[in-house]
Amino acid sequence: MGGLAQILKESGHEISGSDKQFYPPMSDHLKALDINTYEGYSIQDMPDADLYVIGNALSRGNECVEHILDNKLPYKSGPEMLGEVLEDREVIAVSGTHGKTSTAYMICHILISQGIDIGFLVGGISNMIDGSARLGNDKLFVIEADEYDSAFFDKRSKFIHYSPNTLVINNIEFDHADIFNDLDDIQRQFHHLVKIIPGNGNIVYFKDDKNTEDLLEKGSWSSLVPIGADETYQIDLSNKQIISSGDSYSLEGFVLFGSHNIKNITAAITATHINGIEIKDSISALKDFEGVKRRLEIKYKDSSTIIIDDFAHHPTAIKYAIDAVKDKFKNRSIMGFIELGSNTMIEGVHGDEVFKAAADLDESIWLDKKEVLKGRCKNSSDSETQCLDLIKDKIDHYDILLIMTNKNSKRLWEPIIEHIKGK
């Protein structure tokens, strides 16, 4: 919503907003944009407005929501409002269970490197691009398109409102158990999205993702741009290269590491290539791309210990992160600290898949506040303090600590770093 506020401000609207709390860097960013913010939800803080944009975190019973409904004031969801802003733009939307933020920022970085004044709205914070949103003056607009619901009054996925011209589908898996009952529920929302891609639009996807293949077999009416063996765009993970129309392009020497990032890079290069950017120019732009905060981000390094922070909160993402670290830091011992943070993880929906994903760690410690792992592994606790104490006792025996959570990770890595420095 903060990014949307910036885009609406840049569009010429007067903007103010309320939220439960505001934190840096977004609070500082909104202040710099001269956007008034109010902590908490109070009718007294609500100005007379032409339109009220309601975020999907709010529901019936909220004082401001009830005031809007009781007085028949005009309102829309955030995605619907953004969709109106995007009506005249050429939208590149990045969707899928994993890799949306990284891939979207890669596309932004490529286009900006070509001098294109794009618009964008991406979750997370890039290490190289200022801010997570910009209106821009060019026709092109890049957006991270997630499948979460739009608002309490519109349970369609957000991405339905964005009307993409180019859609990237990185992968599809079951997640967001608080919103979706099963994989079929998620597939249904993606099918609705596929149905609104124009006939002259493009869908970029990976042939090796069965769930995406199953989705597209239900029907597609746009140009399909598969990445896979014997296709126009191919990926060779073992040799770290992209092959397009018989030409090979090396991805060696990139700042980012891990097979999942090679796939993200390939998706970004493919999406920009079909929008007019030469592959060699995209590779040149991405070679020094430093990625996104909280994606395999090194928070501490000395001669004996490395601490890495990652946003992984799904078995597949956990395995991606572990595999990437093992490949980058060969023959190093790795201890993992995994917090069950997402609604799906907290409820234990993934079952034993979380253990399988973490099997290649030398040791794993689990922060499990609902105790769904109790009795199933030795190093799990509902106590954050107990987990941190355990890590402090063990960290000298390992080369790398890999922290994986979608919650505030600073509260986890900061005390460990202080412990190391204080020894």
Question: How would you label these PLM feature ranges?
Answer:
Residues 7-13, 31, 44-47, 56, ...:
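Phosphate-binding loop of NTP-binding sites
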Residues 20-23, 41-43, 56-60, 80, ...:
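Short, polar loop motifs at secondary-structure junctions
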Residues 160-174, 213, 256-291:
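A conserved, hydrophobic alpha-helical segment in the catalytic core
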Residues 1-22, 31-37, 48, 52, ...:
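ATP-dependent carboxylate-amine ligase
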Residues 38-41, 76-83, 121-124, 219-237, ...:
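Beta-strand->loop->alpha-helix junctions that form or flank phosphate-binding loops
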Residues 251-258, 305-309:
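Short pre-catalytic strand/loop immediately N-terminal to key active-site residues, enriched for Gly-Thr
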Residues 239-246:
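Short polybasic amphipathic segments
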